[in-house]
């Protein structure tokens, strides 16, 4: 009977091992990172999984930011939400009002993991913090600011100094004309036109985008980006467009491809576009700060962040939340946050990641890689330049795109377009305000 005894023991051991194998907690993570950025997300997840065999982070690309947010909210309503959802910065107010989230600080507390919220760069963490408690609602991940990318080889050909990018919008208009005259198909193009030409233009030049400190002080805010300074700026771009010096190529990041394929000599785009530019550009390029308005009294002020943060969804079990907390803690560790910053161009979200990157000599070896960080820290933010917290902001951005396109096509004047955008946008703000009180 001994063989039977050994067989039974072996069977019991095998079943135990199978049980352990099946005990791995799967943690779905929906994101909007594609191309080189998606590869780095996968790399971080694989490394975490190797170090934490009881958990398995499963990253899934769910489309652009708007698509991912819509998919996440829809999945929550049917009880199929991921554990972690990446949401862009202007979706913050929507997520806060959704009743679909588990605040990050609660997740760490319940998991029994000590987590220092003060490690994050204040300009970044302030965007995603509860204005009442100061605690993080979501964890900063891929934060960015717009920067100016320029083709140094094209600058040389046009007789411009390749080490001196334009500092003001007035300079940029002059440079774009010279670059176009030198044979470039496109002197200047912009990605994310609403975010860069109105949201960040306003902050960088010390102007409010909306009342109530851009919505941080209440849901009864109204839009204010149809003032003379913003109208003048859009009018300048309109004139450049008529001359052929500014090319409108799309609402999102289309200008980055136009830049790295050599069509456009300059573009303003996300600092997170650096990964793809580094990969695909076949020419010498530089990274400069966003231009500012030469007539703005105290410009430049500070850039406001774009990008996204990681939200934890409600309705998961304790083991899932423990795994989520471990993964978020992993992402914030200096070596991992520094790697993400260095490989992608996104901001170092923690002070330690910035210090480590500097100590490693990365900025010396890669001039311009710290441009986005310097913009963000240029001056302490004013109450109305620390970001936007406006309800229905994704839909407001669509309205802004539509109205700016009416300028580029000659259907409306800049004043008419911005007035209409403000009027239409305020209707959405009132709808959101009403929903939060019901």
Curated annotation (Swiss-Prot):
Output the Gene Ontology cellular-component terms: outer membrane-bounded periplasmic space
UniProt keywords (A-Z) are: Periplasm, Signal, Transport
- Cite the InterPro entries for this sequence: Bact_solute-bd_prot1, SBP, SBP_1_CS
- Where is it mostly found? periplasm
The transmembrane residues are none
Entries under PROSITE patterns matching the protein? SBP_BACTERIAL_1 (PS01037)
This protein's assembly is summarised as: The complex is composed of two ATP-binding proteins (UgpC), two transmembrane proteins (UgpA and UgpE) and a solute-binding protein (UgpB).
Protein name, per record: sn-glycerol-3-phosphate-binding periplasmic protein UgpB
Q: Which organism is it from?
A: Shigella dysenteriae serotype 1 (strain Sd197)
| Gene name per UniProt | ugpB
